[in-house]
Amino acid sequence: QVKELLVEHGEVAGVKTYFDVVIRARCVILTAGTFLNGLMHIGHTQLPGGRVAEPASYHLTESIARHGINYGRMKTGTPVRIDGRSVHFEEMEIQEGEHDYHKFSFMGRDRQLKQLPCWTCFTNPEVHEVLRSGLPDSPLYNGQIQSIGPRYCPSIETKLVTFPERGQHQLFLEPEGESTQEYYLNGFSSSLPLHIQIEALKKIPAFRDLAIYRPGYAIEYDYFDPTQLYHTLESKILPGLFMAGQVNGTTGYEEAGGQGIVAGINAALKCSGGEPFVMHRDESYIGVLIDDLVTKGVDEPYRMFTSRAEYRILLRQDDADARLTERSYQI
């Protein structure tokens, strides 16, 4: 685990680990996600970590910030992970995957992966009553958490407070993989005390015999000001330092993946003496995302939407090859 960014003559020179092992590098890519000084919240309980059972990264934020790079705090949340063997699937509605899907390339090989279904159900007034009883112990509402979370992924307690007139909220039970019984309960992100989460879920018929692997929790973490980056995602202050993902103030898998590929490409090009690779707003959603980050900055976790792209009529799935094949050939 890295604890320090090494800088020589104003440029990145490598990293140092917790075991004081020095790894020299011309470029370093930071994709630390929620691990930088990560702090998890479950009710009044606060646990240091980047994820459940995984240690947070300490000292690295401070190591970078001392060179003049600004940083702040954001938060996100995640739902319980459920043991599928305890679920009454007959009480839920199955949701099969899509069969009429389309690719972004005509050149890829056809690979058929086994498809697993998801399942849907709804909360009810009994669930809401239990959840409301736990609001005084919610870190989101008792002042324990001050950081800003993603606007478009509200916790279940935020849904209750924001939409008190709603008698139910839809939940999606999603398999974590083909070789596990673990399920992700999308729509039930929560930082309420564990006993409140379990008691509330057991009011749903499908979960009356609920068993869980991991509780839902909120997590606070450090991020860096993305306006201090170039469009290549290289730092304007520390040449050779590239950043991607939640450390730039974004939220979402695709957002992180899009930044990761751009940071990786440009780090490799910088090491090999190549020209910088910049994606523009009129040729890709990644270009829109990065341009928004480096020119406007963020005051809440950033998520990509088609409405953010003024060229969205041109940025279609069916013309991705025409837009980007030549760019990929160039690198």
Where are these regions (language model features)?
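Feature captures the FAD/FMN-dependent oxidoreductase FAD-binding
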Residues: 1-37, 82-93, 164, 220
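A glycine-rich dinucleotide-binding beta-alpha-beta segment and adjacent secondary-structure elements
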Residues: 184-250, 278-291
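Glycine-rich phosphate/pyrophosphate-binding beta-alpha loops
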Residues: 246-254, 310-312
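Internal hydrophobic alpha-helix adjacent to the cofactor/substrate pocket in enzyme cavities
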Residues: 256-279
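A glycine-rich phosphate-binding loop feature that marks nucleotide/adenosyl-phosphate handling sites
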Residues: 1-3, 77-87, 147-154, 215-224, ...
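Glycine-rich loop(s) and the adjacent beta-strand/alpha-helix scaffold that form part
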Residues: 30-82, 204-205, 209, 262-270
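An anion/pyrophosphate-binding glycine-rich loop and adjacent beta-alpha core
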Residues: 62-198, 295-331
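Short acidic, glycine/serine/threonine-rich loops at helix termini
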Residues: 7-12, 40-42, 76, 82-90, ...
